[in-house]
Amino acid sequence: MKFGTTLRNAVYEPWRESYVDYAKLKKLLREDDSSRKDDTWTDEDAQAFYAELVNSQLEKVTNFHKSTYQKLRDRTAKCESKLDPIAKAVQEAEAPASSYAGAAKKPSPSDGERKRILKEVLEELDLITKDINELEKYSRINYTGFLKIAKKHDRKRGGRVSSIRPLVKSRMADVPFNNEDYSPLLYRLSAMYSFARQNLEGQDRPLSLVESIAGEESYITHKFWVHMDNLLEVKTIILRRLPVLVYNPQTEKIAEGSQQDPSITSIYFDNPDFKLYSNKVEHKTDASNLRLRWYGKLSQKPEIMFEKKTVKTENTSADERFPIKDKYIQPFIKGEYHMEKAIEKRSSRQVSEEALQSFKNSIADIQSFIKDNDLQPVLRANYTRTAFQIPGDDRVRISIDTNLAFIREDAIDADRPCRDPEDWHRRDIDDAEMEWPFKSIRKGELATFPHAVLEIKVKNDKDYEWIDDLMNSHLVKEAPKFSKFVHGVASLFEDNVNTFPFWLSTLEEDIRQDPETAFEKEQAKKQKQQEDELAVGSLMKSKSHSSYKPGGLSPVGSPTDKTGSYLDRRASRQSAMKA
């Protein structure tokens, strides 16, 4: 489907006039005017196009997003104000009588008034939630439109000298509509929904978000980009607390000096319409991805894992996985083999009935998922991983991926397939044991990533001061929703998809930061977090979960055990500010 059609279908009618005028920009490019004899593209034409694109269309979208988001925040605050008298009345009713002795109590709303307020707030929350979803869709489709029209310009009117796509990406990296974090606002809405419903329906107070997280084992994942200039310092900060771990699916042990970090290969699946990609970019409920993954070279006969991950919420997912031998992968994809031998082996090992059934379910689910969605291997991601973790201690798990390369693995173009359609992987790569930087791969089939990818997984979202310091330092660039699968598809199949991840424009900027500027941004961010958490504190009736509180002890040693690095100087500044 052409992007112009996609844009028309995506328009939210009340905001129609505020979208990028894609048709007008195409007209300025004279893309569809094939009857015109003189197709000369003058400097005046170029200036008029760029002015309309950046000064008019981009400015229009930016201003609309900014004003709409502020209105949503104002509407949210108004709902909190309406609920405040009810929240205070609930707290006073639950508190011991002596707690309020001598205190002047404000009159509580009557039962009828309370119900009216709660119903009105719930109705308004539904409208706010709907508008937030529409605003996110609005931002994404406009972001994609700017990238698409810039590419059209470069193809028809550009060249190495007059290419504007990098300039457009750079401009968009600075505007809020492509990097707005809606999470704090959603957290406030969630608290009000919970409070209003339990008071309207008379239910016992359920566990707050903070309490429910503390009551179960879960991991909170934080993702960052690391500029190669900062990579060594980041590694040394981590390895002073956590040892480098040999990354192997069967064993875990501390790495020895002679060992190299292993390479990891993932082959991702999708269909010719890139349905799985679109679902993931648009954050659809139960968006899934499917991949084959192994460590090292395929010629070394590594264990190959079939893995399906389904996102349930922003921080939780359901995983299904099982090992499969090389020779069975293609028949499994085609539905000719159903892992009978593997099931038989497990049955003979006296595996528990529950584990055996789970294994069978994973096999059946993944095979039907392939068939129902017409999936094929489309993308290879290859990278080198350094892992940090105390063996046997999973409270903190950190990985750093470098030399990240994406390679087309598809057979979508029947005339020029990148992969033999009758095979599950590219033998020109694996038989030749190609490695980074994959110089033999044809142009257009390879994309590399300029930064290292840092991933920090913390059990139960526990705070560690040294991790908090690292995450908020100038050494890393936050990339909360970064996905290798999404980035690879967006980089190599941009003509096949009509939606892009917001982080693409950020790649055009220098992610290195001045330490002082980064520190000031951190303080402003924490102040904003505190304000948002304070707004819902009375509704949650529990201590707000703030990242600004002192961290816990490191899994290895004390967080105060620091050397003369940047983080030392940063800690000194924080101490001075608190004094």
List each model region and its residues.
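Phosphate-end processing signature that detects enzymes handling 5′-triphosphorylated RNA
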Residues: 1-579
